[in-house]
Curated annotation (Swiss-Prot):
Predominant neuronal expression, Expressed in most brain regions including striatum, hippocampus, cerebral cortex, diencephalon, brain stem and cerebellum. Highest levels in cerebellum. Also highly expressed in kidney and testis, low expression in skeletal muscle and heart. Coiled coil: none annotated. There is a cross-link at K1176 (Glycyl lysine isopeptide (Lys-Gly) (interchain with G-Cter in SUMO2)). A motif (Nuclear localization signal) lies at residues 16-32. A motif (Nuclear export signal) lies at residues 1026-1034. Induction: Induced after vascular injury and by growth factors. Decreased levels with INF-gamma. Phosphorylated in vitro by MAPK8/JNK1 on Ser-732. This is Atrophin-1. The modification Phosphothreonine is found at T646, T662. Residues 157-173, 207-218, 344-373, 701-711, 732-745 have a biased composition (Pro residues). The modification Asymmetric dimethylarginine is found at R1108. Keywords: Acetylation, Cell junction, Cytoplasm, Isopeptide bond, Methylation, Nucleus, Phosphoprotein, Transcription, Transcription regulation, Ubl conjugation. The gene is Atn1.
């Protein structure tokens, strides 16, 4: 049992927190109040929540609670696990399917809790989120549900939550914070805590209160001074909020270990922040605002808890906090870690969102989930632990079922489970928890399962956890054995975390859970929790770990509690002592890389721890009380005792303890019990500590809480009430039974006032009033909490405004963009008109880049050449004009492109040379002249200035001429630039132009007017056309096509042979086409112009003439033939693209044609066969 107890403690802490509605609430409260766990969680959650909020806002709400839960650490996990505890699930899942009023309440509470918790939990979850996924099978679900439900729940719970949650959060926060702060102080506070605990008890969360004022204050102060509520709540919630705010949290969060989680949260929360809003919302939206402050509190507090911080660190590390944040989901640090590992981020995040719920679940899933659950389970820990664990595990989903269980199934399981759970449950009492509790009961089997899981998990877990695996199992065992040795736990936790990472992804949530759980279980719950918790929640876990551990380790526990609070690890470690917090932290941190997790845990745990501590302490509960003189001690003892003595007694004693704890703690009535025991202890555990306390208490206490079951319920109630810090005590009577609570009555009476807030009891659930949602708190004016809330609200408002502004700006930008586009269109039209009239204004450029044309797809080098490709290059634009008949054609019928446009494929329109030429020559020439002039002017900068650049492009036969230059093969293959065939090309240097002109003949002379040149080209084309009849000429012309095409592919292949052949052909065969004079295609054929220094090519041989021949006409028309030079690069580019496919087709066609006319080739073109076959092959290949 001890182990279990520990586990329970942890469970409680982890799961507990989450589990019991109370816990959850408490968690939430605690989450809120507990800076650490919750805070962290919360914060985390918050951050996460924020994040999630955004995403999961709702879910997150749920999640928030989750976060809280997470804070609960994995309370939710556990919860999830436990979701088992129906409540959780209920909350989450159940939320959707609220189990029972309680559940609902729980939900509510939980919601709130979730709110707060969510954050933490979320965070955890986030951490877990990692796991989110991770766990959340049940957990996730649960978590999700939780988150989601929670969201809902929180949403609804919100109503109360607002006040309450915030309150609770503060309380939670505070406690947590206290925890956090506590931790540092814990020792001291313990005592005070104790006393305060009681109030805290009531506050449970109020661990701080336990810290009593000091802690509280500290908490609060630490938390946020008054922040306790504020701060801590904030922490948790705030944390969440902060986290949410998150980011603020982040920073803030960071500071606080608790916050760390938040930070994680922050990180995790990054999302959470969004979530936090939720959380805050749920948790107390304000809290959101406050959270920052809270966080600050938290920070103060948090920092204190090194564990947390370590968590933080670790957290910061990915593992816990870091992980958490990082994973954000790491939430469950390890869970997250694991989850994170696997899921980590995604889930984390997603989980965060979705995971958020999931995260929780993941947390849940992760060990956390289980832990949480387990924690619940663990809480039940021994029995419950098993049960719970199982439950958790089982429950994870079972939680759901458990939820059903929740009904009070849990009570039965409660026996032990319940015992544990009850507390949990009791805490959960809030329905959620109850559910959980119940859940756990059902889970008990799972527990077995869990246990098995434990083992199994360990295996899986380990496997999953990898580290965890080894560790967990070992740790599990370790924990188990070591149960009291939280350290192992931490380690396991760590491991878990580490491992968890892995496990989380998949099953490990369960396994994790399991592992955790089982860790926890084996551990004692503490471990479970620790493991679980630590690992899942990391913070929660950790804290649970330590908290539990703390608890678990009674001795150390006491301090650990502190420590626990402080650092689960600490606790865990033996650091139990406050010192441990550090130590723990260190160890835990160290050990636990997850200490980071612990941060989460811490948050949770811290909270938990604190609470646990408180709880423990108080709960120490009572039992511990004696043992744990220091609260922690007490707690520790309690836990320790607890574990040790108490556990047994615990479980059994639990009731008493529970009672003690519960009543006292729970009730807050008895200071120890009240705070320590339950409220603090149980409640603490349950509520604030819930996770811690819950775990601790629950775990520890919980077992005692078996009794606390009832107590826990109280605790739960208290926990819920806890938010009402002091209120708690008054709030919940000490109902022995945790079974379905009576339907809540709406009372709306002030229940308790803390330094920073006034708690109003919204619903009276009779003895079972533990749902955080039952209470809502209104921050007192002037309190830090109020300030934080205001700040948060302000911040949110500012952010919203900022977003709105940005949106408007974007809208305006879009409008401007559209306007610009319209302007461009107008300019384009104008340009076209002007261009047609010969004075293409500069706007012409816009023509170039006409949207339709992919202007020049990089079909070829040419196409890719910057000058051409740059849509903005003037040359391009000009070319585009040419290339885009549709652009130019519109107004002018005479436009060369005009006629062809309608008939031909747009891509080729420009190339319908025959059509072009058929139009009125005079008009065409005039236009061309004008255009050419314009183009030249415009091109000068683009092309003439960079002739060298272009030449390569156009070195080719004339790119203008060559349809293929587009191919690039040719283009690339340009002959000596000097030979650039395209006399017209602006890029040609004057000399080249000169040379070309001379070579090509008058038609090409640069000095010729464009019109003249066109005429010359036309003549040339005609000449060629005559040749067109000559198959050889045609062939050669065609050759160019295939060749070019091939060119692009294999430059050298036939090229050389063909070149020779063609050269011969062009030279000898077709004297007609004197290579130089006529830019016959022959010459041009396949070789880059460079090859044939025929300026022929350059001269626009008008293929259009050639095209006129049937053979070539179709293909050519299709292919933008090498059209006239005037067509220019744009055309070429265009053609090029269009051509590629065409070319291949053409080549094949020609090939056949060639075969038919082979004899015609006077020139031996042996390569031709080759070439064609090659070509054919090529054409089969994609271009």
């Amino acid at each position: 049992m001890k182990t279990r107890q520990n586990k329970d403690s942890m469970s409680m802490r982890s799961g507990r927190k989450k589990e019991a509605p109370g816990p959850r609430e408490e968690l939430r409260s605690r989450g809120r109040a507990s800076p650490g766990g919750v805070s962290t969680s919360s914060s985390d959650g918050k951050a996460e929540k924020s994040r999630q909020t955004a995403k999961k806002a709702r879910v997150e709400e749920t999640s928030t609670p989750k976060a809280n839960k997470q804070g609960r650490s994995e309370e939710i996990s556990e919860s999830e696990s436990e979701e088992t505890s129906a409540p959780k699930k209920t909350k989450t899942e159940e939320l959707p399917r609220p189990q029972s009023p309680s559940d609902l309440d729980s939900l509510d509470g939980r919601s709130i809790n979730d709110d707060g918790s969510s954050d933490p939990r979320d965070i955890d979850q986030d951490n877990r989120s990692t796991s989110p996924s991770i766990y959340s099978p049940g957990s996730v679900e649960n978590d999700s549900d939780s988150s989601s439900g929670l969201s809902q729940g929180p949403a609804r719970p919100y109503h109360p939550p607002p006040l309450f949650p915030p309150s609770p959060p503060p309380p939670d926060s505070i406690p947590r914070q206290p925890e956090s702060g506590f931790e540092p102080h814990p020792s001291v506070p313990p005592t005070g805590y104790h006393a305060p605990m009681e109030p805290p008890t009531s506050r449970l969360f109020q661990g701080p209160p336990p810290g009593a004022p000091p802690p509280h204050p500290q908490l609060y102060p630490g938390s946020a001074g008054g922040g306790v509520l504020s701060g801590p709540p904030m922490g948790p919630k705030g944390g969440a909020a902060a986290s949410s705010v998150g980011p603020p949290s982040g920073g803030k969060q960071h500071p606080p270990p608790t916050t760390p989680i938040p930070i994680s949260s922050s990180g995790a929360s990054g999302a959470p922040p969004a979530k936090p809003p939720n959380t805050p919302v749920g948790a107390g939206n304000l809290p959101s605002a406050p959270p920052p402050a809270t966080f600050p509190h938290v920070t103060p507090n948090l920092p204190p808890p090194p564990a947390l911080r370590p968590l933080n660190n670790a957290s910061a590390s990915p593992p816990g906090m870091g992980a958490q944040p990082i994973p954000g989901h790491l939430p469950s640090p390890h869970a997250m870690g694991q989850g994170m590992s696997g899921l980590p981020p995604g889930p984390e995040k997603g989980p965060t969102l979705a995971p958020s719920p999931h995260p929780l679940p993941p947390a849940s899933s992760s060990a956390p989930g289980p832990p949480m659950r387990y924690p619940y389970s663990s809480c039940s820990s021994s029995s419950v632990a098993a049960s719970s664990s199982s439950s958790a595990a089982t429950s994870q989903y079972p939680a759901s079922q458990t939820l059903p269980s929740y009904p009070h199934s849990f009570p039965p399981p409660t026996s032990m489970s319940v015992s544990n759970q009850p507390p949990k449950y009791t805490q959960p009492s809030l329905p959620s928890q109850a559910v959980w509790s119940q859940g756990p009961p059902p889970p008990p089997p799972p527990y077995g399962r869990l246990l098995p899981n434990n083992n199994t998990h360990p295996g899986p877990f380990p496997p999953t956890g990898g580290q965890s695996t080894a560790h967990p199992p070992a740790p599990a065992h370790h924990h188990h054995q070591q149960q009291q040795q939280p350290q192992p736990q931490p380690q396991p936790q760590q491991h878990h975390h580490g491992n968890s990472g892995p496990p989380p992804p998949g099953a490990y949530p369960h396994p994790l859970e399991s592992s955790n759980s089982h860790h926890a279980h084996p551990y004692n719950m503490s471990p479970s929790l620790g493991s679980l918790r630590p690992y899942p929640p990391g913070p929660a876990h950790l804290p649970p770990s330590h908290g539990q551990v703390s608890y678990s380790q009674a001795g150390p526990n006491g301090p650990p509690v502190s420590s626990s609070s402080n650092s689960s690890g600490s606790s865990s470690q033996a650091a139990y002592s406050c010192s441990h917090p550090s130590s723990s932290q260190g160890p835990q941190g160290a050990s636990y890389p997850f200490p980071p997790v612990p941060p989460i845990t811490t948050s949770s745990a811290t909270l938990s721890t604190v609470i646990a501590t408180v709880a423990s302490s108080p709960a120490g509960y009572k039992t511990a009380s004696p043992p744990g003189p220091p609260q922690y001690s007490k707690r520790a003892p309690s836990p320790g005792s607890y574990k040790t003595a108490t556990p047994p007694g615990y479980k059994p004693g639990s009731p008493p303890s529970f009672r003690t704890g519960t009543p006292p703690g729970y009730r807050g009535t008895s200071p120890p019990a009240g705070p320590g025991t339950f409220k603090p202890g149980s409640p603490t555990v349950g509520p604030g500590p819930l996770p811690p306390a819950g775990p601790s208490s629950l775990s520890s206490l919980p077992p005692p809480p078996a009794a606390p079951t009832t107590g826990p319920p109280l605790t739960a109630t208290q926990i819920k009430q806890e938010p009402a810090e002091e209120y708690e005590t008054p709030e919940s009577p000490v109902p022995p039974a945790r079974s379905p609570s009576p339907p809540p009555k709406v009372v709306d009476v002030p229940s308790h006032a803390s330094q920073s807030a006034r708690f109003n009891k919204h619903l009276d659930r009779g003895f079972n009033s533990c749902a955080r949602s039952d209470l809502y708190f209104v921050p007192l004016e002037g309190s830090k909490l109020a300030k934080k809330r205001a700040d948060l609200v302000e911040k949110v408002r500012r952010e919203a405004e900022q977003r709105a502004r940005e949106e408007k700006e974007r809208e305006r930008e879009r409008e401007r963009e559209k306007e610009r586009e319209r302007e461009k269109e107008r300019e384009l039209e104008r340009s076209v008109k002007l261009a047609q009239e010969g004075r293409a204004p500069v706007e012409c450029p816009s023509l170039g880049p006409v949207p339709h044309r992919p202007p020049f797809e990089p079909g070829s080098a040419v196409a890719t050449v910057p000058p051409y490709l740059g849509p903005d290059t003037p040359a391009l634009r000009t070319l585009s004009e040419y290339a885009r008949p549709h652009v130019m054609s519109p107004g002018n019928r005479n436009h060369p492109f005009y006629v062809p446009l309608g008939a031909v494929d747009p891509g080729l329109l420009g190339y319908n040379v025959p059509a072009l030429y058929s139009s009125d020559p005079a008009a065409r020439e005039r236009e061309r002249e004008a255009r050419e002039r314009d183009l030249r002017d415009r091109l000068k900068p683009g092309f003439e200035v960079k002739p060298s650049e272009l030449e390569p492009l156009h070195g080719v036969p004339g790119p203008g001429l060559d349809p293929f230059p587009r191919h690039g093969g040719l283009a690339l293959q340009p002959g000596p630039p000097g030979l650039h065939p395209f006399p017209f090309h602006p890029s040609l240097g004057p000399l080249e132009r000169e040379r070309l002109a001379l070579a090509a003949g008058p038609a090409l002379r640069p000095d010729m007017s464009y019109a003249e040149r066109l005429a010359a080209e036309r003549q040339h084309a005609e000449r060629v056309a005559a040749l067109g009849n000559d198959p050889l000429a045609r062939l050669q012309m065609l050759n160019v096509t295939p060749h070019h095409h091939q060119h692009s592919h294999i430059h050298s292949h036939l090229h050389l042979h063909q070149q020779d052949a063609i050269h011969a052909a062009s030279a000898s065969v077709h004297p007609l086409i004197d290579p130089l004079a006529s830019g016959s295609h022959l010459t041009r054929i396949p070789y880059p112009a460079g090859t044939l220094p025929n300026p022929l090519l350059p001269h626009p041989l008008h293929e259009n003439e050639v095209l006129r021949h049937q053979l070539f006409a179709a293909p050519y028309r299709d292919l933008p033939a090498s059209l006239s030079a005037p067509m220019s690069a744009a055309h070429q580019l265009q053609a090029m693209h269009a051509q590629s496919a065409e070319l291949q087709r053409l080549a094949l066609e020609q090939q056949q044609w060639l075969h038919a006319h082979h004899p015609l080739h006077s020139v031996p073109l042996p390569a031709q066969e080759d070439y064609y076959s090659h070509l054919k092959k090529e054409s089969d290949k994609p271009l």
